[in-house]
């Protein structure tokens, strides 16, 4: 068993708390920081400290913002008629890579009765206030029990509006082999198949 000085051990413990970081990776990261120049460590520390001070949620869409200005809500080139609903702000980063040009609404979670999370615990109230100009709502929510429950709730609530409701297609990833696809994904892919024209 390796005996680390207390300060290094504390840093390893902190890195180990991060998702996807095991003990070995935490050790490597900590030793890398220990061996880095003081300026690099100071910049890293400053970035961490500044993160919690400067990042907030947009009052309209609940996206992550800095300096009280939401670059998505304020972008005049984005369509107000297309609203993509996501679970977390980090989902937006993924969808942005697809060059989506609508706006977003972050729910802040999914309906999960087993965890005591119902519609009142999520950002639905602010969502329904935004629907005046919206013509289509895209539900970009995880295909899980909680995700399906949340989509069912939303689609039921949206019936009173003249809004098109869609969800992300569920299917087989490009470049994958059928033998490695799970049964649920394969079933959804067959049910949601599209005609080749």
Regions found by a protein language model. Give the residues of each.
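Core recognition of P-loop NTPase motor domains used across DNA-transaction enzymes
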Residues: 40, 45-48, 59, 71-75, ...
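Conserved phosphate/pyrophosphate-binding and hydrolysis machinery centered on Walker-type P-loop NTPases
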Residues: 19, 38, 51, 63, ...
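S-adenosyl-L-methionine-dependent methyltransferase catalytic core, i.e., the SAM/SAH-binding region
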Residues: 8-17, 27-36, 152-168, 184
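Extended interfacial segments that mediate partner engagement and assembly in macromolecular machines
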Residues: 26, 75-144
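Cys/His-rich Zn2+-binding cysteine-cluster or related metal-binding knuckle/ribbon modules and their
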Residues: 2-8, 17, 30-84, 88-92
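Long C-terminal interaction/binding lobes of large macromolecular proteins
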Residues: 101, 128-197
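Conserved, well-folded catalytic cores of nucleic-acid-processing
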Residues: 14, 18, 36, 51, ...
